[in-house]
Amino acid sequence: MSILEVKNLSHGFGDRAIFEDVSFRLLKGEHIGLVGANGEGKSTFMSIVTGKMVPDEGKVEWSKYVTAGYLDQHAVLKEGQTVRDVLRTAFDELFKAEARINDLYMEMAEDGADINALMEEVGELQDRLESRDFYTLDAKIDEVARALGVMDYGTDTDVTALSGGQRTKVLLAKLLLEKPDILLLDEPTNYLDAEHIDWLKRYLQNYENAFVLISHDIPFLNDVINIVYHVENQQLTRYSGDYYQFQEVYAMKKSQLEAAYERQQKEIADLKDFVARNKARVATRNMAMSRQKKLDKMDIIELQSEKPKPSFDFKPARTPGRFIFQAKDLQIGYDCPLTKPLNLTFERNQKVAIIGANGIGKTTLLKSLLGIIPPIAGEVERGDYLELGYFEQEVEGGNRQTPLEAVWNAFPALNQAEVRAALARCGLTTKHIESQIQVLSGGEQAKVRFCLLMNRENNVLVLDEPTNHLDVDAKEELKRALKEYKGSILMVCHEPDFYEGWMDQIWDFNKLT
């Protein structure tokens, strides 16, 4: 029996259709991976099933008494709350039960109280608390907080002082502590390092309840799911098995469809040729009419148009001086130092990956090297003739510009055709190009930002988690382009599969701090 069912769902933004009469079901204990290219509608689907977005048509039906938890990276956290306060809200129901027990004991002291009835309710509530390990909640909170790296910045920290990545980890920890019947996870690994991803993988493998997962981290996704829903061309298709099994079946179905299409096209050509040659002759007119009827009744096989794939190409600028950045006794941070004094040298033509736990200062280091924020102590010497291209991890939301407007405003010397061609090279369609940036998926927004980088000549690329939100094809194309880039690269990245094998150096930030 389904615990979540979506029936005849259709939805779009303006004239851009996202879903067309699709259905979906989630059975108890299923581990579903929701997969598809950037912009196909995966996050939109999550927003619809959680009620954050109302579909144009169709129904979303939840079973009675089913609890669901959604990793909402935009949830509002109250000022004055500590990390522990937020994590303890995962057990609000149990704290209410404890408060009810205290009220019942107060009622027992009143004249005429029905002691037996009150004690029976106390017993039921007490059993519920003990079955949920209520009296060891803080130990459970500490266990999950430690496993996801939340302990790195402490559970007594005010949540409003957290970065976007730290905040997301707190929300993920709270969600896992709630242990709902259905987990809805949209890119949960984006802000996790390798150690924490491994823990989350083991947790989800052993999760006895159901979940729906969106992730472009394919090895992680493959290891935790047993059902795939593929989002493509406004449709949702269900496959049994893990991601790699889905790929095999999908490739086979696609190959079979293409072969059937070729056979049918040949048959159509032969029939049309026969009709054209024989319809005018009395002796063969009936045969020609018979062939024409066969053509008219034929169910035509249609191949879906290929989705545009990005083709990244970063232009090098003139050669800079030998040294790009030289940090001397550099201490970074905002109110207090995040590191010991750092002495780092980044030279011309080097490609360096910065790795390490989230929230310990990798982004702050990049911004300090670039001069965006001042150091607490020490200095940064920047080389001569630098042409810097910077890709930020987090950007402000609510951008009402279209990609066409954003790129054209940045490069007014280009004509409209040139701007459209530049965006198309990044894998964006006409509908993407003419939609507001704020309604695009995370991956599509990243492609707009890459387009801005590609149209400038840079001799240094500084990239902060550039693979976040990118689908598999875009990620592979980005890797190829960066490997071939003739300038210097300084990149923060949490995906070993992306940076290993072509970087000159790996700076482990855990060791620098």
Q: What does each model-identified segment do?
A:
Residues F312-F314:
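Post-kinase regulatory C-tail/linker adjacent to protein kinase catalytic domains
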Residues M1-A259, P308, A317-T513:
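ABC ATP-binding cassette signature C-motif
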Residues Y250-Q304:
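Intracellular alpha-helical coupling/juxtamembrane segments of multi-pass membrane proteins
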